[in-house]
Amino acid sequence: MDKKPIILAFCCHYCAYAAADMAGAMRLQYPANVRVLRFPCTGKIEENHLLAAFELGVDGVMVAGCLEGGCHFLEGNLRARKRVERVKQILGEIGIEPQRLEMFNLSSAEGSRFAEIVQEICARIVPLGPSRLRNDNMKIEQGVVEIARQAEMTIKGGTK
């Protein structure tokens, strides 16, 4: 891959985002090509958010939520896992490698684990090469902002 893969990380506010923050506070090294979006719960991440990320041309997507059984919203991370599995199936059907999408569970105290996960997902994406939909990094950056805006509207609207 001539360019570093662009990874979009959908993170739960209470656990994964806090772990990412801890990784930064601990000055742990992980690839800087990961864009983190904070959600109140991974259960608020809709299939269309994940598909929109791939449509933009990101090379990989990770969803990171609370440990199973530890969701602040009870079953949000379980709903997210089902959505991730459905989107992986859709990706395969449209010719995009399903391994470009993965869900991870971690606690807010696992800053080092967050850094490891980012390295793991980047290492998984590099051999796949850039997304066949990737053509303009500026478009991706602007699109990430739009996904964040749409996600905020979804959350405020109270869907699912």
Residues covered by each model-derived region:
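Iron-sulfur-associated redox domains of electron-transfer enzymes in respiratory
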Residues: 1-160
